[in-house]
Structure formats: structure tokens, C-alpha cells
Amino acid sequence: WVKQRCGQDTKIVLLGVSMGAVSVMNALKYTDDVDYVVEDCGFIRVSQGLPFVYRSMVHIPNPFLMPVVKKRAKKYGFDMLDNNPIDVVKNSKVPICVVHGDMDRAVSVECAKELGTVMKNPKSRVEIYEGRDHAYSICDKERYTRMLSDFLDEMFVFPVEQEEEHGK
């Protein structure tokens, strides 16, 4: 849709935070049109994400949650083990910028580090923000903006005649 509306040479960048980060990683499974991804504090396995979502809604841990969810999912033909963002990232060559706070209490910073070990594009990177909790990396506005700008500037190469138009 984007390329039809804006032109085939349009670059598509997806940015997602938390569950949105999971969505942008999984989007890579369904289209080859995505050019770059910025993933901020997403979990890499469904088994990590569902307990977080449950706790955020109910505020108490439930040891019975995963077995019940797995059984219901299977009834509808969905295998949670087949829907892990890390597996999508392993099979993608798209440049990905992974962002995570090292004090994240919802999704372990280890998820970001593990993503860093499986990303195939040499322009991919992992940015860890010290002292930041879940989805709070953006509170370091200057660094976050610079990080996004640097990542995207590295990806977008404008022809010489467009440099003035884009402020280069």
C-alpha cells in the first residue's frame, strides 16, 4: 500500500515500542517491502510476552496462565512456539536497530542482547540505555533522537541532486 501510494522507491521504516516492537519484528515475516526496523524493548519469545501482558493488566503473577493459553491457542491452530520474533529476525536481512533499557523490569535486557547475536545485516545495532526501565529509553531524548538519526542517515543515501533538498 505504501509503495503504491508513495512510489516504488519509497523506503519503509517500522518503529515499535514494547508490543509494537514485537509487531514490527513479526512484520518482516509477511513482506519484503520493509527496509528498516527500529525495535524498542520488545520480547523475543511469546512465552516471555504473555506473562508480562497478563501482569500489566491484572497486576499479579499467574502460574497457570501459560498452560491455559497454550491449550486455547492450539485449539485454534496457533502454536506459540511458531510465533517468536527472534526466529523472524534470524531469517531477515533487514537492518534493525534494537533499543532497550538495562533496568527493564518487564522485558529483560537479555532479549536485546540475544537479538544482537542473530541479526544478519552488518548495519544492524543494539543500543542499551543505562538506568532505563521498560519503554523509558526515549526519556533520554537527545541520545534517542541522535541514535535514530544516525541509524537512518546511515541507511538513506540520497542521489547528489537530492542532497540540497534533504539538507545534506
Indicate residue ranges for each PLM-predicted region.
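Conserved acidic catalytic loop of the alpha/beta-hydrolase fold
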Residues: 1-10
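Short beta-strand/loop motif that positions the catalytic acidic residue
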Residues: 91-93, 98-100, 104
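Hydrolase active-site cap/lid region
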Residues: 26-78
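Acidic catalytic loop of the alpha/beta-hydrolase fold
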Residues: 103-107, 134-135
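Catalytic histidine-centered segment of alpha/beta-hydrolase-like enzymes
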Residues: 132-145
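Short alpha-helix in the alpha/beta-hydrolase fold that links the catalytic acid
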Residues: 85, 94, 108-117
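Catalytic histidine neighborhood in serine/cysteine hydrolases
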Residues: 116-135
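Gly/Ala-rich beta-loop-alpha elbow adjacent to hydrolase catalytic centers
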Residues: 16-20
